[in-house]
């Protein structure tokens, strides 16, 4: 099951939160979903240069608040906030509502699955060899503190006549473990041979009661090793 479904959707309410946060009625739900989709498409298109990882939309009464999580927030805000005001005006024209926009920075861009997927897609569009692009992103993620990463590309790789799928994995990516914090990203590369899909899974540790715990399994391993050695002496 964990291998097939979206890992973010599988963990909603466990260790992941919704990116659209509002309470719908039967009458307003369709229009709100359509509006959220328009907002995300608009921001992805307008802020492509800033490395947008996630867009969170919150509604309360007649207020609409959008939080953009990006790798380069300074490019979105601009000098004296000029650029962010242009984005606000564009959104206001699109949905005919007042919108407040918050900008958050991605703490570790190399360990963000969405940014990693877009990075691979960009390299494929520049005709970089797909294996080189995948391995480069994987090495950067592991250096940034990721516990494991899996990258999969599908399509006419290297201009092959028949589409195929190839993937690489480093470290652990426990997709069946619900307490595991798995980040997931998807992007598409528009090449001269067609569209190549890129999927990235990044394992960042296990979420327990006290938050993400990285070292617990390593400590348990160190405790078990002396027991084995004692049995070996017997």
Curated annotation (Swiss-Prot):
SUPFAM superfamilies: Prokaryotic type KH domain (KH-domain type II), Ribosomal protein S3 C-terminal domain. Part of the 30S ribosomal subunit. Forms a tight complex with proteins S10 and S14. Keywords: Ribonucleoprotein, Ribosomal protein, RNA-binding, rRNA-binding. SMART domains: KH. Belongs to the universal ribosomal protein uS3 family. It comes from Helicobacter pylori (strain J99 / ATCC 700824). This is Small ribosomal subunit protein uS3. InterPro entries: KH_dom (IPR004087), KH_dom-like_a/b (IPR015946), KH_dom_type_2 (IPR004044), KH_sf_prok-type (IPR009019), Ribosomal_S3_C_sf (IPR036419), Ribosomal_uS3_bac-typ (IPR005704), Ribosomal_uS3_C (IPR001351), Ribosomal_uS3_CS (IPR018280). CDD domains: KH-II_30S_S3 (cd02412). Residues 39-107 form the KH type-2 domain. Binds the lower part of the 30S subunit head. Binds mRNA in the 70S ribosome, positioning it for translation. The gene is rpsC.
């Amino acid at each position: 099951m964990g291998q097939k479904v979206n890992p973010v959707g599988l963990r909603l309410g466990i260790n992941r939160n919704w990116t659209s946060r509002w309470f719908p009625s039967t009458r307003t739900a369709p229009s709100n979903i359509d509006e959220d989709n328009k907002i995300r498409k608009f921001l992805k298109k307008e802020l492509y240069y800033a490395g947008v990882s996630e867009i969170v939309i919150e509604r309360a009464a007649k207020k609409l608040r959008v939080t953009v999580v990006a790798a380069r927030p300074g490019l979105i805000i601009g000098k004296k906030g000029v650029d962010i005001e242009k984005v606000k005006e564009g959104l206001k024209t699109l949905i005919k509502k007042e919108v407040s926009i918050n900008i958050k920075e991605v703490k570790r861009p190399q360990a963000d699955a969405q940014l990693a997927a877009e990075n691979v897609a960009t390299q494929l569009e520049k005709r970089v060899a797909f294996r080189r692009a995948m391995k480069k992103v994987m090495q950067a993620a592991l250096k940034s503190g990721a516990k494991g990463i899996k990258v999969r590309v599908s399509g006419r790789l290297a201009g092959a006549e028949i589409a195929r799928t190839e993937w690489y994995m480093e470290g652990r990516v426990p997709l069946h473990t619900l307490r595991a914090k798995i980040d997931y990203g998807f992007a598409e590369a528009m090449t001269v041979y067609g569209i190549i899909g890129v999927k990235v899974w990044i394992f960042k540790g296990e979420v327990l009661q006290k938050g993400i715990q990285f070292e617990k399994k390593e400590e348990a391993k160190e405790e078990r090793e002396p027991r084995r050695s004692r049995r070996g002496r017997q």
